[in-house]
Amino acid sequence: MLRRIHDKKPLIHHLTNTVTINDCANMTLALGGSPVMAEDLLEVEEMVGLADAVVINTGTINPDMRKAQLLAGKTANRLGKPVILDPVGAGATTLRTDFMKQLMEEITFTVIKGNASEIKTLLGQAARTKGVDVAEGESLDLQSVHAFASQTKQVIVVTGPVDFVTDGVRQHHLDVGTKRLGQVTGTGCMTASLIATFLGAGYGRFDAAVFGTYAMGKAGETAGNRPGIGSFRTGLFDAVSLMTEESLPEVQMNGQ
């Protein structure tokens, strides 16, 4: 059990996609947080005011969701609440690319987490996508990510075979996880929920990004010997729910 999180039980407001919303809620609970998924424009500002952190996930956007996400992000900025962007599908269509530009122009994010294709799109670089998934063979210059984080004062997480986290000053590589994480939809979305839960419990933004990303990778390794995809997915929740404080110094001591 992660005592700091369980003691506070941070409220994490998700404006997320309909494909993985239940998994994001359960992963937040597994780590010790409390999820809420309020999308109505009439209550978004009030809910952000109650929340300890906000997640904006663009997986299944529509006109109302786009308005709600913009309002939630701006409200979080005004109130000084951490806000995480998971730019799912960035670069896949003109609509998504244009909306990402609007989000980046109008909201300052605490942490941005995405795969190589999504982050390249946010950096204004040409990217190849396959729906909401990263295209095979897609590569990204990590120094450009580091520079972007420094310029925007936002923590950037690039997920992949080796995850990369930078705040523009520090950078951290996480060689943890399993290919099986790519066989279950929503593991990236759940990673954003984990990062938000650490943020909501008062961890620093760089540490929260590293710890949340590490937690998903480590859970994948722990559940990796389960025979089927269904039991593997369940094992992810089990592994996160059983994590303790002792696992976190291991992340802190890794080379940066």
UniProtKB/Swiss-Prot annotation:
Which keywords does UniProt give here? ATP-binding, Kinase, Magnesium, Metal-binding, Nucleotide-binding, Thiamine biosynthesis, Transferase
* UniProt xrefs under Pfam families: HK (PF02110)
Q: What is its EC number?
A: 2.7.1.50
Which InterPro entries does the UniProt entry name for this protein? Hyethyz_kinase, Ribokinase-like
Give the main EC class: transferase
* Positions of ATP binding: 113, 159
Instruction: Tell me the GO molecular function terms.
Output: ATP binding; hydroxyethylthiazole kinase activity; magnesium ion binding
GO biological process terms, alphabetically, are: thiamine biosynthetic process; thiamine diphosphate biosynthetic process
What is this enzyme's catalytic activity, as reactions? 5-(2-hydroxyethyl)-4-methylthiazole + ATP = 4-methyl-5-(2-phosphooxyethyl)-thiazole + ADP + H(+)
Q: Which cofactor does it need?
A: Mg(2+)
Q: What is this protein called?
A: Hydroxyethylthiazole kinase
What gene does this protein come from?
thiM
